Each structure stands twice: as structure tokens, then as C-alpha cells.
Amino acid sequence: MEKEVIEKLKIPQDVFLPLLFSIKFGGDWSLKVKSTNVMAIKEKITRFDEEKMVGYTLENVFLFLNPVILNQEGIIYRLEKCGNKKEREIVKRPYKTTIDAEYAIKASLNPMTKKISLKKVEGPFKFKGSNAYGVSHEMEHLLEDEMSGEPFFEFEYEIEE
């Protein structure tokens, strides 16, 4: 199934991996393929019908080839853990991020229709909140920067009465 999609999109198989991982395993993913940086960022949108009391969460996964950060705004302090790190660290991430890419695909996963719609999209792309944090985190991987933050063990317990 994926092989046909890759052929229709006219992209190398390796480049499709972050999108596939995000679709199958969830989360954001990045990969360096030869001279190409590839990143998948997942956005969740919940739709709920108040009258019928039923809804679904649409997942939009964006695949970016050679993404570039155009702008970042704000600072959010948050806990993150990545790969070979033993525990989470306190890191700074932008609240808003604008990026562009040489090539971008948007995959929309709808659990109600059981369809994955794919289309080529043009930037720039604006993300805020957790999606902006994901962009920042994955760009660190692509730029081969090690995530650095304050160790979690510097937290202190506080009992409120």
C-alpha cells in the first residue's frame, strides 16, 4: 500500500519514513537521508457534535523535506525526554514557529472514514503550542544538536496543605 503512495508522490522511499512512523506509531519524527532533512509533525484536531454527543480526532501529519525555521516567538519551559536520555529535562521551546520547506505533504487521518488523504501543500507553515515544540525538537535532531536542558532531578517536592 505505501509503495504505491510513494510512487505517486514521486519521493524516495527513505523520505517517506517519518510520515509513515508518525501515522503508525504517533508523535513527531525526523530523519537525515543523505543530503535531505526530513521531518514529520503531527497536529490533532478534535471535532465533536454536541447534539449527537459523538466526535473524532482528526490527525494532520505534515511531512517536510529540508525544513527551515523562518521565525520563532515566545518561550515555553517544558519537560521533554528524548531517545538515549535517561530522564526528562527542562527545556526552552518557542510558543510559535513558522517554517518552510522545499517540499511538503499533508496527510489527514480520519478515524471515522478510515481514510488517509494526502496532498502536496505550500508554505510557509505556522505552528503554535505543542506543534511548535515538536518542530523545535525535531529541528534539533536534524541540525545534529543535542537536546540540552536542566536535569529533572533538580525539582523539589512540595506538599501543599
List the model feature ranges, each with a label:
Residues 1-161:
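Positively charged
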